[in-house]
Amino acid sequence: YTFQDENGRVVFTFPYLNDYTLIGTTEEEHKGDPNDATISTEETIYLKSIISEYFGKNLTNDDIVWHYSGVRPLIEETGKDNRQTTRDYSIEHLQYGNNTLINIWGGKLTTHRVLAEDVLKSLDYHKTWTATEPFANAVNFKHFAHGLINEYPFLDETTAKRLGKSYGKRSLDILKDCKKDKDLGKHYGNGLYEIEVKYLINHEWVKKPESVLLFRTKCGIGMTSSQIEEFQTAFEALINPQK
């Protein structure tokens, strides 16, 4: 759903990970290091208020299981505030002899593919193709998920579907040596097993436990504080086996 408050500010809500609702908005200006961006207390209160009004349920801080923030670059337009500023992007070419430098200004998640295609068009590199080609290792998800469940009956359905959706054909690389449930290694909670964590360390180069829990798998959102603490200790041992 998309909501607007009395001032016209937009708030979005999306179904998320089957059991949650993702709530968000934009237009809060951030100054400083993008890595330091985080939701403010005022923004939290604002989102709880508008969602409580539209959903007819009084949301509290206890309903918040996780939050994250990001910074989106906008192209500055004199005399316009953040709400009026274009969300479009600009591609700049600079030529240094035979070398070309391309700068991209603006852009957002929902335009990343067309932006990339525009860059390639400007280089006469390749005709557009992404609308008809699957992602690398992509599969017919419904059939593939059923295949995983049949091939590895000791996997619960939720975990099998998550692995298939997250890794596609690469989930077979994760599970290739598994013949029984013990081969999955330690279960840290919420469907996260040691064998997947080792794959992420060795093949996706994760360095921090939160990269596993909150970004790669999202399993940490449904884990208890004690499970997270235990995983953090186990992760340190996995990534630094010499210690």
Language-model-derived ranges and their functions:
Residues 1-24, 28-241:
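C-terminal catalytic lobe of FAD-dependent flavoproteins
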